From Swiss-Prot:
Enzyme class: transferase
UniProt keyword Transferase, yes or no: yes
Subunit structure comment from the entry: Homohexamer.
GO molecular function: ATP binding; magnesium ion binding; phosphorelay sensor kinase activity; protein serine/threonine kinase activity; protein serine/threonine/tyrosine kinase activity
The protein's name in its UniProt record: HPr kinase/phosphorylase
Named cofactor requirement(s): Mg(2+)
Binding residues for Mg(2+): S162, E204
Organism: Azoarcus sp. (strain BH72)
E.C. numbers: 2.7.11.-, 2.7.4.-
Summary of the function given for this chain in its UniProt record: Catalyzes the ATP- as well as the pyrophosphate-dependent phosphorylation of a specific serine residue in HPr, a phosphocarrier protein of the phosphoenolpyruvate-dependent sugar phosphotransferase system (PTS). HprK/P also catalyzes the pyrophosphate-producing, inorganic phosphate-dependent dephosphorylation (phosphorolysis) of seryl-phosphorylated HPr (P-Ser-HPr).
Source organism superkingdom: Bacteria
List of catalytic residues: H140, K161, D179 (proton acceptor), R246
UniProt binding sites for ATP: G155, N156, S157, G158, A159, G160, K161, S162
Segments for region (Important for the catalytic mechanism of dephosphorylation): 267-272
Amino acid sequence: MRQTSVARLYEDQGPRLQLTHVSGPLDAVLSVAEERMWPADLVGHLNLIHPTRLQVLGAAELEWARRQSREKVAHHLNGILSARPPAIIVADGCETPNIVHGVCTAHNVALFSTPHPSASVIDQLRLYLSRQLAEKISLHGVFMDVLGIGVFITGNSGAGKSELALELISRGHGLVADDIVEFSRTAPTVLEGRCPELLKDFIEVRGLGILNIRTIFGETACRRKMRLRLVCHLERRQPGQDDPNRLPVQQEQQVILGVSTPRVTLPVAAGRNLAVLLEAAVRSTILQLRGVDSTQEFIDRQSRMLMGDGDGL
């Protein structure tokens, strides 16, 4: 179960949203127990159907409450707060009504106020929770920023991942993480990779030991995070192993946290410039993201030639 607390939310987002703690404990928990439930579902406008959400009251909700009888408003508020939502936030700079304060106190629910618009508060908290409570996984490899594309370099121990990363850094690309990469699924089709705090800025290269990339190459050689766009697997051929497919019609894919990501396999051999090959793979990926598929273009050209339409090349 992925979870965070109201206290942590208040600490992280309080200054940005100018949250004022009016009353109530901060020990309530926001948790995601089901994979099909996204963290962004944990916050929204005042809602009787989803009473367990973090509830945000804006000017529209308070205007509706003013037109109703006190008994009706109290009935609805008690119905919502009896489900123990993590907190109530009064937004739009509105003054907190006494009835809201009283019901929150009676049910021991945290109450906050903010001058920010309710829609802005919800958007900001949804973004925060989607990152804070995202599905996470740690994988072995090197994560790089190559030409603005997040590339995850994998391979067996001794395949040359760190050496390739060092070569790419010397060519002006950026390091995100070496050895262990933490991936988070921040949206249905988005994987974001970053480095554990302990390993940040460091890379380990056989024969050289541990190097501080930020100190050696400067601030621009390191990245805080990147979106994963390509997996590059380094494969050292074993005796008797078949040659890799030279003309793959279907692009290889790797699934991480349910998100499918393009993958290329680069055979490792003496004399092969893997940095150049990886840069070419990244440029090809950029073209594919724009709808340009070089392999399919070649197949189409060959088909036209076989059909006797060679003049149309």
